[in-house]
Amino acid sequence: TFSGCKNEPSSEQKNDKIVYSNIVSEKVQNDLMKILTDSSITTERQNVLFDHIKQFNSIVNSKNLVSDFEEYDAKKTKYDPYDMQDEWNQKSPNFMGYNCRITAFGIYRDFLEIPQNSDVNNEMILFDLSALSEDSSVLLKKNDENAFSIFYSVVPTTLTKDIDTHVATLQESWKNRGIKFAKNKKASLISVMFHESIDENDNYLFVGHTGILFESDKKLYFLEKIAFQEPYQLTRFNNRSELNDYLMKKYDVSYDQPTVSPFIMENDQLLQEYKRITD
């Protein structure tokens, strides 16, 4: 079961160091602003993102957030996810906040071509749609809510552990629905795909976690919203192998299941450095 974007605390990682910030300090916010601008993210979309970041960071206890870029054990978050969830619910009882899919869509929407004539299966994004009904500020274009539902609709698949089969199924679904990823030399959409199996004849893929990958000054920066009541995080990597390891150690946590392991897409292609972590 995935945890990254659901309304529940995210799972822990194994013992590894990562360099990240919760985008609290003015310096990191300015760094991110430059990265976004260099990646052709519009000022309007940046304003929405920073409004949401500042809203979250003002509601939770700043002592539990990483202000500047610091190295931390990825397994030991500075915050307790359950305490942070309680803190958010006390101060914002009528709004659950924003999750990874809402955040990534809001940033990257201008580089997604999503025709409006597709069927929709909202089974895995009901919390997302509830949040968007309370605050639709990321939906800047006409029909964006429908586009959101189309893009994150579950994709029927087969009960197999063969990743190539699932990647081809996902790509074919996007192609058949006319979904295209526009070229952006400095940014791409990262999607961690999960396989849900109800029974042998009822299987589907869905985006369990997502974020935006930026290239800047020969480094990679992965921007994500960890979960509804967990922070925004900007993590710095040297290469895509480090990104792969970070995501797979966090989300590939099931064993002996009949479904395929989570796999990572960069736009509409399997992440070139994708591999399972077997330690």
Q: How should each PLM-predicted stretch be described?
A:
Residues 222-225, 238-279:
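Low-complexity, Gly/Ser/Thr/Pro-rich intrinsically disordered linker/tail segments
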